[in-house]
Amino acid sequence: MRHILLILLFCSSTVFASFDMNERMQKTYTHILNLEFDIAKELLHVESNKNPNNGIIILNENYIDFLTILINEDQSYYSNAKDLKIDRLKACKEKDKNSPYYLYVQSEIYLQWAFCHLKFENYTIAAYEFIKAYSLLK
């Protein structure tokens, strides 16, 4: 009986940890908003080593790309980062579906990419991304 209880406890803790907005992730977010991407990337690296299943890592990585694209207006960076979006969304879908962050993170990624597509005048794709973001949250 104890073994079953320990297994259930372990499994539930890993499920709930799939989206963990812990102190390190909050600091990362603050550094991203301050455009201190190098510091944010270091914190993301630490979090990836300590808590590799944390879905908030995916969101914060996407924030870095989103702001880099909007600020630098670099077409090649934009083109390369589009592939990362697909990988990030796939990774999000493997996380805890019962978490309140599950749909939010996916929607936020779509919304950020909608603005990136607008920046480079890809209006049709941007509209699709806006609709996708909205449909996840309604």
What are the residue ranges of the model-derived segments?
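Short coil/linker segments at helix-helix boundaries
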Residues: 19-24, 28-43, 58-138
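Short solvent-exposed coil/turn linkers within tandem alpha-helical repeat scaffolds
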Residues: 50-53, 95-96
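Bacterial Sec-dependent signal peptides at the C-terminal "C-region" and cleavage site
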Residues: 11-21
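Conserved structural position within tetratricopeptide repeats
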Residues: 48-49, 135
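Sec-dependent N-terminal signal peptides
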Residues: 3-13
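Terminal low-complexity, poorly structured segments
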Residues: 1-5, 40, 55
